[in-house]
Amino acid sequence: MSTRRIFGLETEYGITCAAPPGQQGLSADEVARYLFRKVVAWGRSSNVFLRNGSRLYLDVGSHPEYATAECDDIRQLITYDRGGERILEGLVADAQQRLELEGVPGTIHLFKNNTDSAGNSYGCHENYLVRRQGDFTRLADILVPFLITRQVLTGAGKILTTPAGATFCLSQRADHIWESVSSATTRSRPIINTRDEPHADAELYRRLHVIVGDSSMAEPTAMLKVGATDMVLRMIEAGVPMRDMALENPMRAIREISHDMTGKAPITLASGRTVTAVDLQQEYLVKVRDFVESTGEVSDTDRKVFDLWERGLLALQSGDLTSVERELDWVIKHRLVRRYQEKHSLELSDPRIARLDLAYHDISRTEGLYNLLAARGLVERVTSDVEVLESTAVPPQTTRARLRGEFVRRAQEAKRDYTVDWVHLKLNDQAQRTVLCKDPFQSVDERVDRLIESM
């Protein structure tokens, strides 16, 4: 049985323009226009596919969104996700320069987080290609309790201000999720979005669209988030029986888990059993590890995921988080917050703490707190700077993204008018030649070669 899967991450970014005291800052719409000016200039649109096979566009609510090219390896996926940050950082530099030329005050910041000060939420959507065979309801039933409880390890952390005061939560998205499974993404915000757009052969595949997760700054957190989910899916697809872990009230559970830093908040299952998020994650870990090891197909990434999954749960059980304080986002952030609080004798509700929370997610390599920690070697990495830089210009070589990226590059170099999406490559000439690429695993295609040669 092949464990190869297509993955993709879509990340919506928060955007702001900090104006000097006493001056009116630009609105998010205005900042977005400056940010995408260069993109619109060459792409004639604020929705474009890039030479690296990825998609860059302006989403509703003026959120820049970057969707990685199709990846078939988790390390590759994280590399292309980080590459998106670098591409957007370049757009920020260009927009900043334009502001200064026009005498407009303010500094543009992009945040890879999931909530803004007005209480709006925007997402990090995970995409997993799954086989069409099998019961989707069963898949969702097994996956939802896993996705609700994984936040104890994969949450990005957040200072939540309530009428009762400020509190540190595990997840940024948890308070904004209202359903387990739905076809909407904004109105009801489900854990799993069921809108069926496989971007592949619909008879063979469907695209599982998970929208409950937090955006990850820490690369090992991203690896665990996607890697553990991938292995749970492998087990489900193989038909392995799983004890019923359905939650009595999933929406209450997701919030109660997020608001309890110990991972030990009691949650009630539909069966009446009372457990904790750590208990359920431990159950998934044991079951998944037994299954994956029994297949004999354990990759290096699988081993790293199991190691961090296990160490994270042990750390929560013991209350000593030092073993994961360089790898898990919320733990890294909580440590920063605690030290800053102690140094300056601050309450958690102090606005300076909220600014620190935000600065952790700033994608700037000179101002973002996470990136400054990474530059000083204070957090663990999965990728390298060289690979991330390469990913901004070169598509993954093992998936359909290679065909798209190469087509875009050659069409741009030949100054040809073209249209592309996830499955179509089209030259907008008299012949209107189009190639349909339905197989996301296919990186070589004679039809695409001929289309490129015809330029």
From Swiss-Prot:
InterPro entries: Pup_ligase (IPR022279), Pup_ligase/deamidase (IPR004347)
Signal peptide extent: none
Annotated binding of Mg(2+), by residue: 10, 57, 65
Reaction catalysis annotation: ATP + [prokaryotic ubiquitin-like protein]-L-glutamate + [protein]-L-lysine = ADP + phosphate + N(6)-([prokaryotic ubiquitin-like protein]-gamma-L-glutamyl)-[protein]-L-lysine
Pathway: Protein degradation; proteasomal Pup-dependent pathway; Protein modification; protein pupylation
Active site (catalytic residues): 59
Binding site for ATP: 55, 68, 422
EC numbers, comma separated: 6.3.1.19
A GO term, aspect molecular function: ATP binding
GO BP: modification-dependent protein catabolic process; proteasomal protein catabolic process; protein pupylation
Keywords assigned: ATP-binding, Ligase, Magnesium, Metal-binding, Nucleotide-binding, Ubl conjugation pathway
Disulfide-bonded cysteines: none
Domain of life the protein comes from: Bacteria
Pfam families membership: Pup_ligase (PF03136)
Presence of the UniProt keyword NADP in the record: no
Function: Catalyzes the covalent attachment of the prokaryotic ubiquitin-like protein modifier Pup to the proteasomal substrate proteins, thereby targeting them for proteasomal degradation. This tagging system is termed pupylation. The ligation reaction involves the side-chain carboxylate of the C-terminal glutamate of Pup and the side-chain amino group of a substrate lysine.
Homology family: Belongs to the Pup ligase/Pup deamidase family. Pup-conjugating enzyme subfamily.
Extra information: The reaction mechanism probably proceeds via the activation of Pup by phosphorylation of its C-terminal glutamate, which is then subject to nucleophilic attack by the substrate lysine, resulting in an isopeptide bond and the release of phosphate as a good leaving group.
Annotated protein name in UniProt: Pup--protein ligase
The species this protein was found in: Sanguibacter keddieii (strain ATCC 51767 / DSM 10542 / NCFB 3025 / ST-74)
Taxonomic lineage of the native organism: Bacteria, Bacillati, Actinomycetota, Actinomycetes, Micrococcales
